[in-house]
Every structure is written in structure tokens, then in C-alpha cells.
Amino acid sequence: MDTKETMTGTANRDAELLGSGHGLGVVCALTAGVWLGAAEAPTKLVNSGLSPYAISLCMVAGVFTARWTVPTLLKGTRYVFADLGRNKHLILNAILAGMLWAVANTLTVFAIRDVGLTIAFPLWNTNSLVGILWGRLLFGELKGASAKNVAKVLLGALAIVAAAVMLGFSTIHGDSSAHGGRALSGVLAAAGASLLWGTMYIPYRKAYISGMNPLSFVTVFTVGELGTCFALVLALDGGTKAAVFHSPEIKHLLFWLFLGGFVWVIGDLCQQFATKYLGIGRAIPLSNTNQLWGLAWGALVFGELAHANAAHRLLVVAGSVVMILGALAVSTAIASERENVSTKQALERECSRYGLDSARVLAAYSGAEDRTATRGEQDARGWWDYVILAAAAGVFVYLGMNAQAPPLTMNAAWLWALGAVLVVSAAVCGSRLWKVTRFS
């Protein structure tokens, strides 16, 4: 009897520990939306004849720089490589996830070309529904959840997709039939991007229920990103003769593309932590609120809706309200004890499959990793860490000195206001992550 009670008590404590990160995950996901929505703003300052492949490659080069810099700043390379050493079986998964991202991003290029951003963006935002499906099938998410919570997640995700459609149509001006001749290919490309971006979260989730730190995962993830984008330029954009390798104008544009990549990395890191603490089904819909923030930058800073009529403005207001309500529904769907038990079972399957220490993995997954890691691994930093940080800062300073911004009307007041939102959201999210998990 005592043994049974002890086992029950342990299971309950484990389930409680697994569910303790919901609030933190919501903060991370909403912060991801803020930063991912702002990531496209610097690229609006790029006015060149470079192909989308070239622009994507340059932006991912900025991503690569930031991907190595931020983990080094927060944890140090000793920690990152020790974590990778404990999870060698996940390195290939991380590279594969990066490749999926790069291919999906390329499909969005074709989707935008063929049907326009207004239609393409809402279509690939259905990746949240793909993610909910994979989360349920592979990781037991929503298994054991109450009907109320299931309804909150599903209806909230659908509301966010519907809001994305409304916000997309609010930006339509002029002839909407310009892309009509390639509509089918554009829709298929956007649907493909949705499928790949929803599937990309499988390696994410698999890594985190194995105890891997998101900072370590993204360090390897970016290798797949950069390698695939480089291969796409070589295969589809002129090979070694591509303009990105030879154009004298490229040095004036790189700062803005690198800056966009850096902003995107901050958002994606928040999204990674959200996936860890919320699961796929809740994290993707909440981070997809990025379209609301992207619209805010376009409308308020760049004046993209300056000539919109009353109907378009009504769509903006209605879409914004629906998206906020959808996010509210998902964020309040706190996992029950039964659902947390399903998560623990998925975690134990990974531990059994790969011979992992279940106690260490549970501690790492719940953000209590520092209690089990060695002090030397946590605190020691090599001299090369400071070299990496200095080199990255030097790259941005050099590119900034050569940057040229085309004449473009911007609302300075809103630029500073939205910039302040970025800083405050990152500070709040970062302080919560540090206080609760020490960035674990």
C-alpha cells in the first residue's frame, strides 16, 4: 500500500512539474509573435534587383551569425557542446529541421509571386493546424485533455487563421487579378510551405522531450538552414555566377538583411522555448500572431494602409480582435494532469529508446536543469566565447558602416514606439526565462 501511494505521489509530482511551465510558454510564444512580425521590417529597406533566393541567403547568413552568438552569450559554447554531446542522436534531426525551414521558405517565394502575399500568408499560417495534428499523433498532446481545453485550442487556432485571412485581405489595393494565371501553383506552394513548417516542429518537440536545450538545438538547426539556402542559390539562381556573389551593390544592402535575420532569430528562439513548454499545438497558433505585428509595422511605420478605405480599415479592426480572442483561447487552455501524464509517457518512450537518464531529462524538460548539471559546465566560459561575440558585433558594425537606406517615408514616432515594444517584450521574456529556468 505504501509503495503504491509513493508511486502515485511521484507520478502526481512529475505531472505537476511538467505542467508548471504553461505561463512561461505563453509569454515566450507571444514574444515570438512580436519579434517574428518585426523581422520583415528591415527588408523593406532593401530596394535591389537581387532575386528572392539571394535575399533569403543573405538574411539566413544574418540568422547564422545570430544563431551562434545568442547561445554563446547566454550559455557559452562549453555548455552548448556538452548538451549536443549528450544528445548526439538529435543532431541530424536539427539539421533536417533547418532544411525543412529553408525549403518551406523558398516555397513561400513562389507562393507570393503566384498569388500574392495577401492570399499566401493566411494559407501557410495553417501550419498551426498541421502542428496540432502532429502533436496529437506523435507526442500525445491534448490526449486526456478536457473537451473544454480541446475546444479552446482548436477554435483558438482556427480563429487565428481566420484573422490572418481578414488581415491579409485588408492589405489588398488595386487589381487583385494580377496573379490569376498562376493561382493553382501559388496555392500549392503555400500549402506545401504550411505542411513543411507544421512538420518542422516534430524535430523541435522530439529534441525537447529528450532534454535538449533550445539554444543547443538552434545552433545546429542553422547549419541546415544556411546549407540549404546556399544550395538553392547555386542550383536555381545562376550558380557561382549569381548576382549575390558579384554585385557591387550587395555590400550596401547586407546590413538590413542581417538585421532582419537577427530580429527573426530572437523571435524564433522565443518560439523554440514556447514549443518546449507548451507543446506544438499551443505554441504555433500563439506565435502565429506575428501577422498582427507585421501589419502594425507595415501600416503604422511604413504607411501601407494610408489610402485604405473604410472597409479595409474595418477588416483590420475585426481581424485584430478575432486574433486576440483566438490567442486568449489558446493561452488559457492549461494542460490538465491527465494530459501531463501523456507528455510524461512520451518523454519516457524517448528515454527508453535512446537510453537516456529519465530523471535528468525530466528536470531539463521542466526547466530545472541547473539543479542537475555540473557547476563547471554551467559557469565556465572559454576565451573563444568572447572572440565569437566580438566577431559577431564586428560584422554588424562593419555592415552598418557600409549600409545605405533608400529614401522611404517612415513614421518616426511609431518606429520608436514599436521598437520599444520589441525591447520590453524581450526584456520581460528573457527575465522570466532566466528567473525560472536559467535559459534551460
Question: What is each stretch, according to the model?
Answer:
Residues 2-440:
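Polytopic alpha-helical membrane proteins, predominantly small-molecule transporters/carriers
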